UniProtKB/Swiss-Prot annotation:
It is found in: Secreted. Residues 23-58 form a propeptide. Coiled coil: none annotated. Belongs to the cationic peptide 03 (latarcin) family. 02 subfamily. It comes from the Eukaryota. The keyword DNA damage does not apply. This is M-zodatoxin-Lt2b.
Length: 84
């Protein structure tokens, strides 16, 4: 009976350890997923900034589009930072 109690206590201890580390791993995975989402968003933003290099963006309205794009990006950055 004594060995059964010791084995049960060890099993409970192992389950407690496994449960406590599982949440940390899940939180780390969620943080990494958020980081990947941010990196993907930044990559798309960089691609959009590079549109002025394409031949399609050059033309009669190219300068207006660039000017509007820069103003829109700076406005979005100011709003994101809370500077109104």
């Amino acid at each position: 009976m004594k060995y059964f109690v010791i084995a049960l206590a060890l099993a409970v201890a192992l389950v407690c350890i496994a449960e406590s580390t599982a949440y940390e791993v899940n939180e780390e995975l969620e943080n990494e997923l958020d980081d990947l989402d941010d990196a993907a968003w930044l990559a798309v933003a960089e691609e959009l900034q590079g549109l002025e290099d394409f031949e399609e963006s050059r033309g009669l309205f190219g300068k207006l589009i660039k000017k509007f794009g820069r103003k829109a990006i700076s406005y979005a950055v100011k709003k994101a930072r809370g500077k109104n």
